UniProtKB/Swiss-Prot annotation:
GO molecular function, one term: pyridoxal phosphate binding
Alphabetized Gene3D superfamilies for the sequence: 3.40.50.1100, Threonine synthase, N-terminal domain
Membrane-crossing segments per the record: none
UniProt protein name: Threonine synthase
CDD domains in UniProt: Thr-synth_2
One Pfam family from the record: Thr_synth_N
Modification Phosphoserine, positions: S319, S321
Family: Belongs to the threonine synthase family.
GO CC entries: cytosol; nucleus
Positions contributing to pyridoxal 5'-phosphate binding: G270, N271, F272, D274, T449
Involved pathway(s): Amino-acid biosynthesis; L-threonine biosynthesis; L-threonine from L-aspartate: step 5/5
């Protein structure tokens, strides 16, 4: 199979980009996100043909549908995929765990940084290196193309990006994270990496402040042109593409168990990237009847699917001086006010429901109007018919902090299995789904996004009262032993300020290249 897919911007200002251009640019010049010119279909008979394939083999098949052979040959792509997933600790890469309550937990945390983002960022790091090596060939040092990756993290993206890019030639990586708003393990995973091309920057604010700074960097045409800015956040299409694989792989796992008559996926999500990959899988032909969004108390997605209003802050997050920051929860990777990837889905929604002739140009015009209204007013409301169409694709649930802790307890009591707080948001949502559909024969797959050791505060809060529980012996991996005591390197930037950030990047790059 070989793809002829090209890439276009959701805002309509850029089209006919190659896969390489979409990956290296990350964000289109008009501020839009890259999407494929068409969604390819899974080949006829794919279930029987792929059911016994390994995770890397399925990843190769999926990526071949989106990457033209003229850009990356079959042999080159296979080597990239195999290299990317050889770093995972489990032979199945993303294994399924069946719980006694009937839920199936898809363990996505067996990569180098113990988080689902390794699935995408191990591949993306190798992809960056592949493209740059090809571009640079034997060029002298002062003529080589150099990529400056700038990303924001609420915890897991940062460490996964760093582990995917550390030591890569012709790549520098700058990761912004909110001071005091990531877990100690997450911060240590980032700041203890000593490779000279890795730079961590703390911001006195929240994740959305970091994400806004990254967007401003991408929006600065001159700065972007000078430093060749690249993206590792889920705005980068390659991340979404990589994540499609585990939806197909897990479906085939339950298919082989004879449990695939009605399969539904539950996805804890804040930025909408993880579940968007499931949407693409469904559009490609994956026979799943439902995608279930699980949010924490920062519930912009849940509120949209309940009301049709996409609104940055709810009434509890508004002060006399205006909207305030995301609520601090036990699932910090989802403490997000604005879901960056939701723009991609809104484009497809506009194409299907609002574009008179269902053309990409019309969809981009409508999407741009929605996003401009959202930027101006902090809210945008879609028509009831549009909301009805959205509800055919997704349903959603909101899980509170207390319910998150209770879910960790429930699964420990029933299965002696320990889940992290983000997975707990998904599991609690799954328990509600099971209750609502208890008379139906449905297979639920809940995505488990991180290893519980990364969130000791929440896990210990939930389980410390159990006499048979011991964090160090039951949860803590040997890879984390002593990590908190290692020497750290970090740049403190103070309050969010784009000029200070640009100065930090320029000074650091000049030192790195000296």
């Amino acid at each position: 199979m070989s793809s002829q897919v090209s890439y276009l911007s959701t805002r309509g200002g850029s089209s006919n980009f190659s896969f390489e251009e979409a990956v290296l640019k990350g964000l289109a010049n008009d501020g839009g996100l890259f999407i494929p010119s068409e969604i390819p279909q899974l080949p006829s008979g794919w279930i029987e043909a792929w059911k016994d394939k390994s995770f890397p083999e399925i990843a190769f098949e999926v990526m071949s549908l989106y990457i033209p052979r003229s850009e990356i040959s079959a042999d080159e792509l296979k080597k990239l995929v195999d290299r990317s997933y050889s770093t995972f600790r489990h032979p199945e890469t993303t294994p399924l765990k069946s719980l006694k309550n009937g839920l199936n937990v898809l363990e996505l945390f067996h990569g180098p940084t113990f988080a689902f983002k390794d699935v995408a960022l191990q591949f993306l790091g190798n992809l960056f290196e592949f493209f740059l090596t090809r571009k640079n060939g034997n060029k002298p040092e002062d003529e080589r193309d150099h990529l400056t990756v700038v990303g924001a993290t609420s915890g897991d993206t940062g460490s996964a990006a760093i582990y995917g890019l550390r030591g890569k030639k012709d790549v520098s990586v700058f990761i912004l994270f909110p001071n005091g708003r990531v877990s100690p393990i997450q911060e240590a995973q980032m700041t203890t990496v000593t490779d000279p091309n890795v730079h961590c920057i703390t911001v006195n604010g929240v994740f959305d402040d970091c994400q806004d700074l990254v967007k401003q960097i991408f929006g600065d045409v001159e700065f972007n042109k000078k430093h060749h800015i690249g993206a590792v956040n889920s705005i980068n299409w390659a991340r979404i593409l990589s994540q499609i694989t585990y939806y197909l792989y897990s479906y085939l796992s339950v298919y082989k168990q004879g449990k695939a008559d009605d399969v539904r996926f539950i996805v804890p999500t804040g930025n909408f990237g993880d579940i968007l990959a499931g949407y693409y899988a469904k559009r490609m032909g994956l026979p799943t009847k439902q995608l279930v969004i699980a949010t924490n108390e920062n519930d912009i997605l849940n509120r949209f699917f309940k009301t049709g209003r996409y609104e940055k802050a709810d009434s509890t997050q508004v002060s006399p001086s205006g909207p305030i920051s995301a609520k601090e929860t036990y699932s910090p990777a989802m403490d997000i006010l604005v879901s960056s990837n939701f723009e991609r889905y809104l484009w497809y929604l506009a194409l299907a429901t609002e574009a008179p002739n269902h053309t990409p140009a019309e969809a981009s015009e409508i999407l741009s109007r929605w996003m401009n209204e959202f930027k101006r007013d902090g809210t945008v409301t879609v028509r009831p018919e549009v909301l009805e169409a959205a509800r055919r694709d997704f349903v959603s649930e909101r899980v509170s902090n207390d319910e998150t802790i209770d879910a960790i307890k429930k699964i420990y009591e029933s299965d002696h299995y320990i889940i992290d707080p983000h997975t707990a948001v998904g599991v609690e949502t799954g328990l509600r789904c099971l209750e609502k559909t208890k008379d139906q024969d449905i297979t639920y797959i809940c995505l488990s996004t991180a290893h519980p050791a990364k969130f000791d505060k929440a896990v210990n809060l939930a389980l410390s009262s159990y006499s048979d529980y011991n964090f160090n012996t039951q949860v803590l991996p040997i890879e984390f032993d002593g990590l908190l005591d290692e020497e750290r390197t970090c740049i403190f930037s103070g309050k969010p300020n784009i000029d200070i950030l640009k100065q930090i990047i320029e000074v650091t790059l000049s030192r790195e290249k000296a």
